[in-house]
Structure formats: structure tokens, C-alpha cells
Amino acid sequence: MLKSRNLIQPEDFSIEEIDEILELAQKIIDNPSKYSRICEGKLLATLFYEPSTRTRLSFESAMNRLGGRVVGFSEPNSSSASKGETLGDTMRIVSGYVDIIAMRHPQSGAASEAARYTEVPFINAGDGKNQHPTQTLTDLLTIKSLKGTLESHTIGLCGDLKYGRTVHSLVKAMARYKNTKFVFIAPEELKMPDYIKEAIKGHAYYETNNLDDVIGSLDVLYMTRVQQERFEDKSEYERLKNYYILNKAKLEKASKDMLVMHPLPRVNEIDIDVDSDDRAVYFKQAKYGMYVRMALIIKLLGINED
């Protein structure tokens, strides 16, 4: 049983609780039929105020594969938000209909605000440029499954580190594991925010704008797209969107067992010629997301998985 009934940010769970979720996700991967009816009679609401493919569909697939059902909306114009209904009122109403809620919202901090009004477990499926904790759990499962441990890795994060909520959540989560080192690879305009660097005090980190110089030292390279939707000045986005492009030639400088990860969607930052490389695990990573969300739903609903 998890101590918190909500997941707003990775720190809501202890390392032991995260390990429990990852272990359950692995059990589901190994024997999915065992869990195919465990959420029968349960209802998940997916409330997506912002476009999503992987996160929304993986939540819906997760609940369906557990034997539960899903209701919700995929964009705000199909909800009463378009009529001016407050987030709090929406949460009060929806939590009276369902057993668990997953919400994505473009505003940073919206998840913690929404959770105040729910009477059922609540999952942050991404809030603005703030946090994306279920992606973080997915990333942790990917690293643990393929590297065998979450300790003693050098993690390179490349691209939009200013607006990328996935990297903010991942850095804070990985900083809880021993001997983790970080390399932040970004242009000056998209550097990792100071509040994230402050949160990982005590861990070694290095900042650079040159991927070629550091790729050979990495255990994991986490590529990100430049977040077009966060830019007010579109010319600035156009100038920065292709700042980093990972291709086969660049990969020749990397170690043979480095993992190339990406939260997806990608734009141009990973060339398709990388897809066939054994180190490219981003499609496997996306599939792991469904299993992590299956495990999280089971845990937050307090269902005995045995």
C-alpha cells in the first residue's frame, strides 16, 4: 500500500515505494494474463487539457488491459472548461463518477491544484513545464531493466532542458540514487533551470553545449525535443529546434552499452538511422510506459495484486 493516494511529482513516493511499482511492472511484463481482470469494475477518467498520444493511450490501454474501463476527454473544447467551468469544480464532479483520475494540463502547478478537490486517487499526467512523474517511472523502469540497477550511472540530458518537464522529473528522481552523475547538454537559452540544480545539491553535474565532447562518458543519453508549444517567440523556436541532431556518426563516439532514450515525440533530434542501433531503446521505453501505468493504477487503488 502506498502512503500517498496521489502522484503529483516523483518525490511523493519513497524509493522503496518506487521500487515496489517497478517490480510490479516487471511482473506484469512477465505474466500479463495474471492481471487481466484485476481492475474489473473500476473506472479511470483521463482528463487531457493538452494534446497527447503516448501518455493518454498508454493510460487507457493500461486500464483496459487490467479489466477496467475508461471515460474522459482528449482536449478541453469537448469539456465544460470551454464554458468556463473551474478546474476545482470539474475535479469535484468527475471524482464522484470514477475510481481514479489521470490529468494532463498546460499550466504548471495545475496537478497539485486539481488534486485538492478530488476524493479519489489522482495522477499527474504532465502539468505544463513542471513535472511528468509517470514518464519518470517509465524512464526508471527502462534504465533498471536494461542496466540492472539505478545506481552509479552518468546520465546525459540533451536538448530543451528549460521547458522539458520530463527531464526535470527524471533528474530529481535519479538524484535519489547513489553515485549518480549528470551532464546537462543544452544551448544557453535552454539550460537546466537553477531550481532543478539546487534540488540535486550533493550530486556531481556538468554543463556544456557540446554533445560531441561528452557523449563518450555517458551511460544514458536522454534526448529531448525543443518544446515548440512553450515558446512565445516562434522565431526563437525555429532558431533552436535543430540545435542537436543525434545520428549514426555521433553514436560512433559513444560506448557500446550506452542507452539512447527519448520521451517522444521526436522531431529532428534523433535521425531515423539511429533506430536500428541496439542502443536506441526509446520505442521499448514507450511500451514500458503502459506497464508502469498498469502497476501504478493497481497500487493507487490499493488492490492486492497477489
UniProtKB/Swiss-Prot annotation:
One GO MF annotation is: aspartate carbamoyltransferase activity
Q: Which reaction does it catalyse?
A: carbamoyl phosphate + L-aspartate = N-carbamoyl-L-aspartate + phosphate + H(+)
Disulphide-bridged cysteine pairs = none
Residues the record lists as binding L-aspartate? 83, 165, 225
Q: In the UniProt record, does the keyword Transferase occur? A: yes
Q: In which pathway does it act?
A: Pyrimidine metabolism; UMP biosynthesis via de novo pathway; (S)-dihydroorotate from bicarbonate: step 2/3
**Highest taxon of source:** Bacteria
In short, the EC number is 2.1.3.2
Enzyme group, top EC level? transferase
Which residues participate in carbamoyl phosphate binding? 54-55, 104, 132, 135, 264-265
Reply yes or no: does the keyword Protein transport apply: no
Q: How does it assemble?
A: Heterododecamer (2C3:3R2) of six catalytic PyrB chains organized as two trimers (C3), and six regulatory PyrI chains organized as three dimers (R2).
Q: Can you tell me which family this protein belongs to?
A: Belongs to the aspartate/ornithine carbamoyltransferase superfamily. ATCase family.
NCBIfam families in UniProt: asp_carb_tr, PRK00856.1
Protein's recorded name: Aspartate carbamoyltransferase catalytic subunit
Q: Which source organism?
A: Clostridioides difficile (strain 630)
Mind giving the lineage of the organism this protein is from? Bacteria, Bacillati, Bacillota, Clostridia, Peptostreptococcales
